[in-house]
């Protein structure tokens, strides 16, 4: 019996030593220099659960804020199963973006990479990323918007708002989503049968950002399941259409044509799966991000009468100077006569922080501010920490479009990262600005509007309206 007890004690002692070493290695990862301060959290899960702590519209993530106060503008952690260095200071972030495609490359934590596959076109960088951007801009860039899309965006927006007038309250975000899907879907995939387009649109509309929350909540698991089902159905519709188009050789002048042509080149970048995923992503991102920003702009304007009055003056002047009473918004009006509108859009984008975190990966050991970021570690850039920094923006939690007066309104900077950073700027930036501008134009020139009820805007960490943004509109007298 004493032998058994001795053996048990020996096993427990060895296990304790092994576990202690494992815990020490987890808390103190290997590094060829000095790691940034911070904590790696619990083994395996790290600090992922803390990362998902919900917070309000006018707040930086509590996860980030607590650690900034404790460790400073850069710190280490482990989220989503990846060792990560978090950056919150503009100069440090700029240095990372300056070294893009050299010491840092675009990447996501491994937990995000595995479900989509390492060969997914969205995870590529360098020349492949440039090519993806180039062909996307052929259909969503300024020239395409000017020549092929602005008229349809204007018509669909006008008709949709007219159908909502004097009919009680409706969700502003859903309204913008419907507008986007109505005019964008035919540009991406044209000549769909009505029932096929309805199926695709319904499943794209079911894909929101509510699923990206704490995995410990039952509602999150339910949302993830619904998103998985909707995504599967949407991808199947796109795949079926892609297969038929490829077999028929029919040319429709849409984005799908471009994808079919890309798949037939000798140096293939887009296989069928990549092409289908790109089409899917364009529809989802355009619908989700643009509708959220437009809705938030409506909320801010409804609560800020001074800004709304200035916006109405600007758009009344556009109507007064327009040739042709029934004409829609022209490219000239959009680009050169909507200065205050773009100030409102910039301020909304700054406060919305639709991309609360941007990822890169160190390809070699990199020294920044006396600390070493080890090769293979993820770098997480936190735009809200910059956009809500009172050393950069006076009264940063106040909606103030006039802060953009006299400034460049259409380009990003190291203190304004609403459409990405470094070489990876969002290809849909101009599309988003155009859609928001046209929606605002018709809203303020034709209707009186008000919030139907108080609506909460939550970040968890992606921003969304849990109960939508109900508004009422009526024909202006």
UniProtKB/Swiss-Prot annotation:
Tissue expression pattern: Expressed primarily in the root epidermis.
Compartments, record wording: Membrane
Enzyme class: oxidoreductase
Annotated keywords: Heme, Iron, Membrane, Metal-binding, Monooxygenase, Oxidoreductase, Transmembrane, Transmembrane helix
Endpoints of the signal sequence: none
Function field: Hydroxylates thalianol into thalian-diol.
Protein's UniProt name: Cytochrome P450 708A2
Name of the coding gene: CYP708A2
